[in-house]
Amino acid sequence: MIRELFEKEGFTLDEEQERKFSIYLQELLRWNKVHNLTSIKKPEEIVRRHFIDSVSVVRCFERIGLDLRGKHFADVGSGAGFPGVPLKIYLKDIKLTLIESVSKKCSFLEYLKIKLNEDYRVLCTRAEKVEEKFDVVLARALGEFEEVKEILEKLSIGYVFVYKGSKLKEEWLKDYKLCELSLSFMPKSYILWKKV
């Protein structure tokens, strides 16, 4: 089911990626029963609205010609790992730091790292307290854009990408460029990006 849903959106998974996404899905469903990590409960919807939506930014990377080799990514407000962990599974060779301030979510991310045998780092703190700089900073479902963009830009020495779903305000385009995507389950999806 996972591979087919990805392929429907134009993303190809190898067996290892499919296996890791399957483990991720199982663990998310299991942990979600106790810890309420996501409001989306149906497996197919988790694959679409969390895994595929997270990976969709790859199309933006391709459009702007972003060379990902050796890049250090930061996922700010990672929650249950979105978009960082799906991107790590899909892109494989990126260096990834997940920044999350809620301890139960940090525990899940650390546990998931072991289950997936992935190499990423979890910083269990508020983004404002992080002094480190990253090549690519990502944020998805992180509150009001106007309130978080300064924090995201402070963390970046390269690019900032902000997933906005189907919501778009004209004033956001003063400082940020627009990457418009179309997925079967979300005909209009916007990702704002900026080279810092």
Swiss-Prot record:
Q: Which GO terms describe its cellular component?
A: cytosol
Catalytic EC class: transferase
The record's subcellular location field reads: Cytoplasm
InterPro entries registered for this protein in UniProt: rRNA_ssu_MeTfrase_G, SAM-dependent_MTases_sf
Principal localisation: cytoplasm
Among its keywords, does the record have rRNA processing?
yes
What's the Enzyme Commission number for this chain? Answer: 2.1.1.-
Residues that bind S-adenosyl-L-methionine: G77, F82, A127, E128, R140
Superkingdom of origin: Bacteria
Keywords recorded for this protein, A-Z: Cytoplasm, Methyltransferase, rRNA processing, S-adenosyl-L-methionine, Transferase
- One Pfam entry name: GidB
MF terms from GO for this chain are: rRNA (guanine-N7-)-methyltransferase activity
**What family is this protein classified in?**
Belongs to the methyltransferase superfamily. RNA methyltransferase RsmG family.
Role, per record: Specifically methylates the N7 position of a guanine in 16S rRNA.
Designated name of the protein: Ribosomal RNA small subunit methyltransferase G
Origin species, per record, is: Aquifex aeolicus (strain VF5)
| Higher taxonomy | Bacteria, Pseudomonadati, Aquificota, Aquificia, Aquificales
